[in-house]
Amino acid sequence: MSVPSQFDAGLADGEAAASATGEASQTSRTDGRMYVRTQSFGSTDAELRFLQRCGVHHKAASFPFHEGRGWDLDDLLREKERFESFGLSLDMSALPIYERFPNIIYHGKSPERDREIDLVCEMIRTASRAGIDSLRYNTCILNIDRTEPEEGPGGFRHTAFRLDKIPQEEQDKLTDAGRVTAEMHWERIDYLLERMIPVAEEFKVRMGNSQEDPATPPGYRGVDKVLNDFEGMKRFIEIQRSPYHGWNFCVGSIAEMLEDSANEIYPFIEYFGSRNTIFLVHYRNLIGGRYSFREALPDEGDMDFYRVLKALKDVGYCYGIDPDHVPSCEDDPKDYYQSYAYCFGYINAMIQAVYGEA
C-alpha cells in the first residue's frame, strides 16, 4: 500500500526545517556533534526516501548472514553504496549474537562457543574493512518481554510491561537455557569480552552492548539478569579497559531499572559518558519505572528529553541519537510512519536546541 500524497506532502513541508540539522549530521563524525540516526526502520528504496524527507542522514543496516562465515564484504559494500546514493551514511550494524550464536551467552557451551566467537570476531573484521566503525550487540539470556499494548495519545499503541499482570507460574517457567545464575551469566560475558574486545580494538570498531530489557526480579524465568542496575553496568565496563568497549546506551531500558527516572537517569549519563563508554543512544521515554511502565513518545514520558540530550552533550557524546521503539496506530498507512516522523523531527529539533540553534 503506498503512502497517501497528503502524508508525503506534509513530510516534504518539514524537510526545510530539518535541513540545517541534516547538513550538520553528515559531518557530525568529524565535528563532534550528535546526529539523528535510526536502526529499526526499514531499508527499502522507498523507506530510504522517507528518511531523506525526515532529515535523517545516518542509518544502521542488517546484512545477509552466511552460515559458517557470517557477513560477506561485498554485501556490506553494496549496501553501503546504495545508502550513499540516498544521502545516507551506513556507519553502524548489529552483531546477531542472541539470534545466531546461542552457545556464547544463552547456553554458554564449550567448545561450541569458541567456534561462534571466532565467527563473531571475523564479522567485526569484515565490518571494519567495509568502513563500519560501530557495532551493537547484546548479552541477554531473555529477549525483550512485554505484556499487552496500551493506548496513548491519538490512539497510538505503545508497548508496556506490568509484572503484576504476569501469573507467578509464568514467571517461574524456565526457558531451555535452564537456570542461569548471576555467576553463570557473568562468566559467559567475561569469556566473550576477553576474546572479542581485543579484535575490536585492533580493527577500531566500537562495540556497544545493550542493557537488559526490561528489568526483572532475580530468578525470573530462571535467569538472574546482571545488566539491569547501576552496579552491573559499572562492572561490565571494568571487564575490559578499551576505548572500543562500551554501551548501546538505551535511555528507555535504563529508565526501566529505576523508581524515579526523571531524576535518576543523570548519574548514569555522567558516569558512563565521562568515561567515554557511550557509543550509541536509544532515545526512548516511558511512563512508570521498575517492573511497571508504558513506553511513550519522547515529550510525553517521565523524563525531560531536552535535559537528557543536554546532559549527553555536556559529557561529550557525539554519535547517533536513535528513536528506538516507536508506537503504531491503525490509521497510519505504514503502521509506524507517523510515529517515526514525529520522533525524527523531535530529535532534530532537540539537537538544534542543545547546540543553541533553536
Question: In which residue ranges do the predicted regions lie?
Answer:
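Histidine-acidic metal/acid-base catalytic patches
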Residues: S2-R37, E47-Q52, I104-Y106, D118, ...
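An N-terminal assembly and electron-transfer interface module characteristic of large anaerobic redox
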Residues: F7-A9, F41, D45, S110, ...
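Ligand-binding pocket scaffold of soluble enzyme catalytic domains
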Residues: R29-R69, D74-L76, R82-F86, L90-L95, ...
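A diffuse structural propensity rather than consistent per-protein peaks
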Residues: T44, D72, T181, D302-D304
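Short connector loops/turns at beta-strand edges and beta->alpha or beta->beta junctions
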Residues: V56, P96-Y98, E212-P214, R284-G288
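Structural motif corresponding to the early beta-alpha repeats
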Residues: F63-D190, E194, E201-E202, S253, ...
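Short, well-ordered beta-to-alpha junction loops that form the rim of enzyme active sites
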Residues: Y137-L142, Q211-D213, H325-V326
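Active-site-proximal beta-alpha loop/turn segments in soluble metabolic enzymes
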Residues: E169-H185, Q211-G222, E256, C329-D331
